[in-house]
């Protein structure tokens, strides 16, 4: 593709050099540059891509996109100066890969909790209907049934457009995608065309990055502000920010709720450990999910599928066949008669939702033992809140290590313990070794009890000092239960 074709989608401040050159690849990582590539320098959170411009030129880059031009311009290289490289990178990548999102029905899911579940269940629902479908999520990316490992909730713009391009080329009609607040703020989705967007909820998370809840809200809201006119926005009325999210959107707004009058109205009729009986828009259905938060997630899936043209009755049949997503309220029964639940809950609100769901099913007939930690080098303010919520809704709590990253596990545990009063501390243990913490919970559990192992869910590693060590909560539980993994 000619450089001048790529530049039609962005507004350069200044161009130095030949725009008629052939571009054979686009990169934001100088290590991946090859001869004939366009290297795009971004101000990253860890490193500044501008520092790698000489390395990119040395490796054969024939064009450089940047915010600040180097002091010395290499001969035979075209330099494109832009005001905002984050925005330009997304648009350039979209153009280079043939604007793949315009060939797909792309639906984005954003919010603090529920993104993975809703995106994955939509993917499974439309596969049930017989379509080729793509999924971009925290757990794994999929092109129909081909799994593609994932590093981030939302990939960088180049990886994202390359992936969407493959999905379009391989015949996918629908793609369901988690859209993180980081990706919106960093404009990773710049240039993409969405057919629809779903808002789940907004609670405290990622304040290490966004600094304030207001900034976090603005990042989420921008996704809906940028929605095109002929798309839909489906928002959760049960969240106080539901209508705030869509107040400036050009898209058609629809609502879903378990509490209020809405376009898609749901109720929980019955709840058991095996699942729930629900009412969606005056239709009853039985599902293999537990908890009001999952009823809300399923209602969002129902609404989105209907907005994408499916009949309500057909969607209800599809929903009744679905299974819970890996690491989301993932229950296994022990030979001793207690139940262990592995869940990704890593925010105070998500933890409350899971514990409430457990109590809703238990009805006071067994103890709840919660194993929980908090991630290192992340929002420290939520640590004492997590511990307090765990203690409030559990009979025993074991505070342990999660992904300590570059912090000391005991320091994180101490931050969590600071949220507990004297009564809370009487029922709380702190065990830094996560495996030992889970083992202790199993030793304390009796028939009819429930152990919640919270925070990591689907993850199969522990991030310690920059190294990912294999660790899987479900594997550990099965090992303790003496079950075959």
From Swiss-Prot:
Q: Please provide the record's keywords in A-Z order.
A: ATP-binding, Cell cycle, Cell division, Cell shape, Cell wall biogenesis/degradation, Cytoplasm, Ligase, Magnesium, Nucleotide-binding, Peptidoglycan synthesis
Catalytic activity, EC: 6.3.2.13
Please give the family membership noted in the entry. Belongs to the MurCDEF family. MurE subfamily.
Residues binding UDP-N-acetyl-alpha-D-muramoyl-L-alanyl-D-glutamate = 30, 153-154, 180, 186, 188
GO annotation, biological process: cell division; cell wall organization; peptidoglycan biosynthetic process; regulation of cell shape
Q: Where is this motif: Meso-diaminopimelate recognition motif?
A: 402-405
- Whichever gene encodes this chain, its name is murE
Q: Where does ATP bind?
A: 111-117
Cofactor(s) it depends on? Mg(2+)
Q: What is this protein called?
A: UDP-N-acetylmuramoyl-L-alanyl-D-glutamate--2,6-diaminopimelate ligase
Keyword Nucleotide-binding in the entry? The reply is yes
* Coiled-coil residue windows: none
What processing steps or modifications follow its translation? Carboxylation is probably crucial for Mg(2+) binding and, consequently, for the gamma-phosphate positioning of ATP.
Q: Which reaction does it catalyse?
A: UDP-N-acetyl-alpha-D-muramoyl-L-alanyl-D-glutamate + meso-2,6-diaminopimelate + ATP = UDP-N-acetyl-alpha-D-muramoyl-L-alanyl-gamma-D-glutamyl-meso-2,6-diaminopimelate + ADP + phosphate + H(+)
One MF annotation (Gene Ontology) recorded for this entry: magnesium ion binding
Task: Give the superkingdom in one word.
Answer: Bacteria
Cystine connections: none
Kindly list the organism's lineage: Bacteria, Pseudomonadati, Bacteroidota, Bacteroidia, Bacteroidales
Residues with the modification N6-carboxylysine, per the entry, are: 220
